[in-house]
Amino acid sequence: MIRVAINGYGRIGRSILRALYESAKRDRIQIVAINELAKPEAMLHLTQYDTTHGRFHTQVKLDNQHMIIGDDAIKLLHEPDPAKLPWKEMDIDIVFEATGVINDRLECEAHIQAGAKQVLISHPSSSDVDATIVFGVNQDLLKAEHTVVSNASCTTNCIVPVIDVLDRHFEVKSGAITTIHSAMNDQQVIDAYHDDLRRTRAAGQSIIPVDTKLARGIERILPHMKDKFEAISVRVPTINVTAIDLSVTLNKRVDIETVNQVLKQATEGSFSGVVGFTNEPLVSCDFNHDPRSSIVDGTQTRVSDGHLVKLLLWCDNEWGFANRMLDTSLEMIKAKSRT
């Protein structure tokens, strides 16, 4: 049984907990502690009720600085300094670092110094971590000695498996990406100050361009794609689910049927449970609470001149990513057991 602590109980932290309790992984992963500066009553309430994912299906209550979920007692901590957390005495195997602000090796080492054996970061990190993993593509890179690992981003997890399939079958020459991402908590409800002038504007009233490092994220997972992709991102007034408009130029000649067939076969084979494929006329809310990293919308596949391919990909940027955190943590422990 993997003993896990969650540091940061926001959108991703809560989704990880809920995803675990809805999955078949509870016999292998146990959340024993959550460190969050918010009050326990607020943590309890936001565990029980969620605007995006609905009510939690299991009874939850507070008891003596613990959150009780069924028969499980999860210790609630409120320590701002990770180095002071009681990870050694709690025998923590992996810390899910989900604050969104700790993203390099030096900062994560505080968890190791506090006694945790490994750290899995829930967002893109600096290049000094041991590995950046997109589950389904490169988890085989994990080694026993790795202590700080990044789970990349929701959009990297969405797009990299698809690029990988296209490249192996048709040789990707170059590509351009537009991420159509739901609003996030770094935006304003009404106009208010922010360092990014576009993010001073009300999130519910505009389509807002934001910076993205998605192209660099692709290069980190697929190094041979260096300088082959560019990406832009816009935030839209929805609370969950992201669409990605992917255009790629392929060296090999293709048609719509061939592209869709190859992608569909991948979802039934090596990427089963990670990438999906649909030919149904669906919209973004239909992918809410979908545990997969990416769903290819076959109805939107287009091919121009036999080499330029446009795809539409969907993902639940919270739920799919939370499920990959669980998957990657299991792979980290598996790699560690190979010593």
Swiss-Prot record:
Positions with a binding annotation for substrate: 153-155, 199, 212-213, 235
EC number: 1.2.1.72
Cell compartment(s), UniProt: Cytoplasm
GO molecular function: erythrose-4-phosphate dehydrogenase activity; NAD binding; NADP binding
UniProt-listed Pfam families: Gp_dh_C, Gp_dh_N
Record site: Activates thiol group during catalysis: 181
Reaction(s) catalysed by this chain's protein: D-erythrose 4-phosphate + NAD(+) + H2O = 4-phospho-D-erythronate + NADH + 2 H(+)
Catalytic residues, chain numbering: 154
Listed GO biological process terms: glucose metabolic process; pyridoxal phosphate biosynthetic process; pyridoxine biosynthetic process
CDD domains referenced in this protein's UniProt entry, alphabetically: GAPDH_C_E4PDH, GAPDH_N_E4PDH
Coiled-coil region(s): none
Domain of life: Bacteria
Annotated family: Belongs to the glyceraldehyde-3-phosphate dehydrogenase family. Epd subfamily.
Subunit structure: Homotetramer.
Protein name from the UniProt record: D-erythrose-4-phosphate dehydrogenase
Organism from which the protein derives: Shewanella pealeana (strain ATCC 700345 / ANG-SQ1)
Gene that produces this protein: epd
